[in-house]
Amino acid sequence: MLSLRQTLATAALLLASLPALAASNSPVGTWKTIDDDTGQAKAIVQITEHDGVLEGKILQVLKSDDGPHPICKKCDGARHNQPIEGMTFVWGLTRDGDEWDGGRILDPKSGKVYKASMQLVDGGQKLKVRGYIGFSLLGRTQVWLRTEMPEPASMPAASSAPMSPQAGDAMQH
């Protein structure tokens, strides 16, 4: 028979493991984006959830042809010429079974906004992110890797310009 101390210790371990289990069933967290052409890491991004809707922000650009702190030269509206680091580039995704769909994703390099879907794979350690026009068959997929949050000293200050998801909705393709 288990003692009270053993029972409490077991319960504490189970409770402590719940956040890790929840994280593996949700895209919420920090991800390293991988370029689907080169296979190289491009950025560290943070996916958050507000009222069942996912949003993604670029925390740190790791590789850019435009220097260490690139701006979105080809973006329209409020994002035009704004720093890419700190920018909301994914918005509006809601859960549909085992994937998140119905949102938009911005390609900061081209300035184009695409429809988006996401699906966790490999026990929640990888995230398949698909950007597409019209039907999901007409698009590209990247696989992102779950990672740790970068140190605050290595991250740039977020832009003070408003970057509401609605600004990108006008750019539907």
Predicted stretch roles:
Residues 1-11:
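Bacterial N-terminal signal peptides that target proteins for export
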Residues 17-19:
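N-terminal signal peptide c-region/cleavage motif recognized by signal peptidases
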Residues 152-173:
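Compositionally biased, proline/threonine/alanine/serine-rich low-complexity intrinsically disordered stretches
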Residues 23-31:
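Cleaved targeting-peptide boundary
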Residues 143-151:
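Short beta-strand-to-coil "C-cap" segments at the C-terminal boundary of structured domains/repeats
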Residues 99-143:
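Surface-exposed interaction patches
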Residues 33-116, 173:
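Central antiparallel beta-sheet cores of small beta-barrel/beta-sandwich binding domains
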